[in-house]
Amino acid sequence: MSHFLPEDEVVLTACQGLALTYPGIGLCVEPLYLLATRPAPQRRVALVAGGGAGHEPLHTGLLGRGGLDAVVPGAVFTSPGSAQIAAATLAAALLGERDGVLHIVKNYTGDRINFALAADQTRAAGIPVAEVVVDDDLATDRAAAGRRGTGATVVVEKLLGALADQGADLDGLAELGGQVAAASRSIAVCARAHTSPADRAPAFHLDPRTLDYGIGIHGERAAHTLADHPSVDLVVTRMLDELLGHVPTGPYGVIAVVSSLGGTSDLELRIISALVHQDLTSRGVHVHALAAGAYVTALDMAGFSITLTGLAPGWAGLWDLPTDTPLRLPGSAASTTTTLAPPTHAPSAARATAPTAQGGGRAFLDELHQVAALAHTDLTALDQATGDGDFGDNFCGGVTAAVHLADRAGIAGTAALADTFRDHVGGSSGPLFGMLFTALAPSADRFPADVPALAAALRRALSRITAIGGARPGDCTLVDALAPAADALAVTPPAEPGRALTAAAHAAIDGARRTAALTARRGRASYTGYHSEGLPDPGAVAIALVLTALAHVHEPQLAGELPALPDMIRS
C-alpha cells in the first residue's frame, strides 16, 4: 500500500528488493532496468516491457524464463524514459546474442512515444526491433487515443514468453502478440480510490454507495458510476455482458483473469472468480484457465478487473507451460468444483439424548431468538471495539440457524442450539457456546425446569469451557458471567424457591457488567489493550442473555425484574 513508501527512491528500492528476492534477476541502477539473467537457451528474441510503477506485479512479476527478458520501470504512474528503454533493450539483445527484440507496450501516450524512440535508437545500432501494443480496456473503446492497455498485458506477456522459449522468430512473436491483444478485452470497477503517494490521502472521492465502473489503472475516473452499490454478482454479470460482446468465444474457450487493483482481499477475489466461472459456463463458454490474484494493480485501489482472452489453436498449450518468474499463473481451470462428502459420524450427543417434546426447550429457543435479535447491533458494536466485530453475526446468526434446524428436523430447541453452534458457527464463540448448549440440552428441554439438573449442567459447561478455552474468572471473558450464574444456581436448597433461574440471570448480568472494569487476558480483546477497557465483554453479555431467556421461560412472573439490554450492558 502507498502508506508505506519511502520519502525518495521509491522505485529503485522496490527493484532492489525484487533482485534480492529472486537471484535470477539482475539490476542496473543507472539507467534503471531489470534483466533476467537465466534465459532459456532456445530463445532467439528478447522480450522487453515496462511502464510506470504502481501496477506491480505487472511486468516484473513475469521477468524470467517463460516470461520477459527485461523490464523498464518508470516513476509511479509515469512512463520510463527512452534512454532507460534503449539501454534495457540493448542489454537484453546482447544477452545470448539474440536475433532481435520485441517491445510489449501498453497503449498510453508516454509509453508509446518513449518505446518508439528507444526502438529507433536500437535499430540504429543494427538490432531488429518490433512492437506489440496492448489496448484491451473496454471502457475507452471510443477514445481518440485508442483503448488503454491494462489487464491483458499479463496474458500477452505469458503467451509470448512461452513461445519465445521455443525459439520463435521476431515476426512470429509480433504476429502472435498482435493476435492475443486483439482477442482480449478488460474492464475494471472500483469502490475506493488509491492512496496518493504525494499526500497519503485518497486520490479522489467516491461516494461509498457507488462504484466507479470503467476505472483506469492510474486512477482515471470512469465515465459511469453504479449507484446503490449493486451486489457483486450483478456487477460481474454486467462486466461479462460487455466483455463477451467483444471477445471471440470459439471452441477453444477463453482465459479469464480476475485481478485486484491493489486493495481487494483474496477472499473477495476468490468469490469473484467463482462468479465469473459460473456465469461463463452458464452461457456455454468454456473456461480453459481462470486466474485470480493481484496481477495489474493501481497501488492500493479497492477494486478489480476482469480480462477475457478468446483462445485460438495452440494458445492454451502456451498458457499451461510453466515459468520461472516471481509471478506464477495457474494453468488449466477445473471444469467444476470438486465436491467432497464429509465422513460419516455418529449422531451428536446433544441430539441423541435430547427429548423430542417441544416444551421448555423450544420455548427457550424461541425466547433466546427474540432476545438475540434485539441484541445483535449492540453485540456487534461491543466486539468491534474489543475484537474483530463478528460476534453479533456469529451469535445471533447461530440462534437463527438453530430455529431453522428445529423447524426442519423437529428436534428440541436446545439440542438444535447445541448442534448449530458446535458444528456450524465459526470463531471461538461457536465451540464455546456449543459446549454450553450441549450441557444444557438434556435439562433445559424439560418443562417445568429441573433446577438441580440445570445447576449441574451449568457446572459441567463451566468446567468444560475453562478446561478447553483456558479462561478463568477475572480474565474478562464469558466465564466471568457463567461462573457466578453457575454458583447462584448451585445453592441447595435454593435461597429463594421459585426464583432460582432469575437469581442466576442476575448473577450473570452482574458478572457481565463487571467485565467492563477488567483488562482482557484471553481472546481477541486481550490484543487491543486500553481499547477494551470500560466496555463489557460481548461473550459475557451473551451469557447473560442466555440466562435471561431461560429465566423468562421458566419464571415468567419475574421477567420484569431483569433489566433490558441497554441497562444490562451498562455498568
Regions found by a protein language model. Give the residues of each.
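N-terminal loops that bind phosphate or other acidic moieties
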Residues: M1-S571
